[in-house]
């Protein structure tokens, strides 16, 4: 299952910003970029009354 690990790139090395659950030597793929920008294409505009109705049905 994919994991999102925030990291900083310094001196040619990606440094995770939190503890990671990986084995020593495990290979990973890094996708650089802003997650918000990538997810924006999946966003759908919905009227506030539809959102309110949805929320009330879930309660």
Swiss-Prot record:
Family annotation (Pfam families): AF2212-like (PF01954)
Sorted UniProt keywords: Toxin-antitoxin system
Disulfide bonds: none
Highest taxon of source: Archaea
InterPro entries documented for this protein: AF2212-like (IPR008203), AF2212-like_dom_sf (IPR024069)
Presence of keyword Transcription: no
Family: Belongs to the UPF0165 family.
Annotated function: Possibly the antitoxin component of a type II toxin-antitoxin (TA) system.
The protein's name: Putative antitoxin AF_1090
